[in-house]
Amino acid sequence: MKRFRLFVYLLALVAALPVHAGKELTQSDRSRISGILTRIVAREVPGAGTRITGVRIKGRRMELTANIGLSYYPFRPESVEAIYDSVREALPEELRRYKLTLLTDGKPIEELVPLPFRTRIDRRRVRTFTNEAARPLVRRLDAPFTPDQGLADRHIALWQSHGRYFDQRENRWRWQRTRQWMTCEDLYTQSYVLPYLVPMLENAGAVVLLPRERDVQTVEVVADNDPGIDPSGAYREEEGLLPWRDAGTGFAHLRGTYRSGENPFAEGTVRAVRTVGEGAAESRAVWSAELPAAGDYAVYVSYKTLDDSADDARYTVRHLGGESRFAVNQTMGGGTWVYLGTFPLAEGANDAVVTLTNRSDRAGRTVTADAVKIGGGYGNVARTVCDSLRTPEGVYAEETSGYPRFCEGARYWLQWAGFAPKVYTPQQDANDYKDDYMSRAHWVNALAGGSERLPDSAGLRVPVDLALAFHSDSGTRQGDETIGTLGIFYTCLLYTSPSPRDTR
């Protein structure tokens, strides 16, 4: 009887084994499937070679893993079904009835179909992002319309391609991308992002943060509580029920140019006052500016985040169109430039162009006041060749780009905006080209550090919902093949890889 039971058990075990036991897809099978996928992807994304990098068979299930190139395809429900049919037809006969999953970028291709194109059932299965921040970084208090769904109060980190940079090996400033049709990608992509994409996102309720200067205005005036080199800006305080006081380190504009490692947000002081409720006499900080010409000017404010900071610091911008009022959440974003908007300003004296009051929904908290930046200006970060690349016969000097700041890459804006060297120069000043594209991911980490997005990391506490790079990938290849528009996204919480396009 025992022998009979053992025989039955072994018979059942053998019957459960797959018919392909001991077999894998041959290299010929992999190559054939890779070729099919490459041809499919090439219809939409030229140059994105696709290959099978892994095969896993368990029971009657098969997982095929493709490289990152497959993820660039714009998947739709019907195309996903067609791709599975094409791959299944290329499998050996004995494997075609297996449950097949095709993976790329760590996900099944069906999960890469955008939500609007999915069925109602598929949408319910998706876990979407939720913003747990009580209030966003900036709110427009007198906006004619305030969205309450969709992108409302979302924080989007967005950058408009490349920018002018200092080439260490050639000892000169240059564009990063190829010159084509009287422009280059460093400039061209901004013509989509700055006048169209950013306002569209902002009008939909999002707070958009950029690692490059967004203002094409070449005039820049800095008004600050600390004396500096800019005589066109002025600061004054008006005391109500509660007095202003010093609140530690802040911004000061003491230099015409900045070397790597020099931080204007660590060279001055910041002012603070406790908040009061309705009915109490308010204290105010007032910034004024003398402008050489009328025009549109971006207005940035700065402050220091404290443990008891107010989440509704109330700013008013006076301009030719009247007044615009904002509430800035000072519990996040301290120690950098925070964009309020772009406004038409008059030539000459603009008194009280920005005003901050200590009136708040809750008394007893703190608002802080530091510098205000008006306009984009010219680049003020000076660069030179690093010691390891210098030659005895070379002539070296520190020099700025000589271009408006909006033309420059992120590496230089991030220094002017108060970020640490580990953010803007991960290559430790040896390679500005790599610093520029790598710094953008580190900037997102620095923004989100300390928020619910990255609670275990130090940073500015801004809960970034999305980071998006907008590129045209302008250029040519051999055979006169052109390269087209490309969006780069990163799906991990924290960027740690040295590879700029590792989208694990």
Features from the language model and the residues they span:
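N-proximal, solvent-exposed amphipathic alpha-helical segments enriched in charged/polar residues
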Residues: 22-59
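Non-catalytic propeptide/linker segments at domain boundaries
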Residues: 73-162, 167, 375-396
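Catalytic-core regions of hydrolytic enzymes
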Residues: 152-241, 382-481
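A short beta-strand element within beta-rich, extracytoplasmic domains
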Residues: 283-307
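Short, surface-exposed beta-strand/strand-loop-strand elements in extracellular ectodomains
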Residues: 307-322
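Extracellular carbohydrate recognition and processing domains
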Residues: 320-348
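Short beta-strand-plus-loop segments that form exposed binding edges in beta-rich domains
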Residues: 355-364
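Single conserved hydrophobic/aromatic residue that forms the stacking wall/gate
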Residues: 495-504
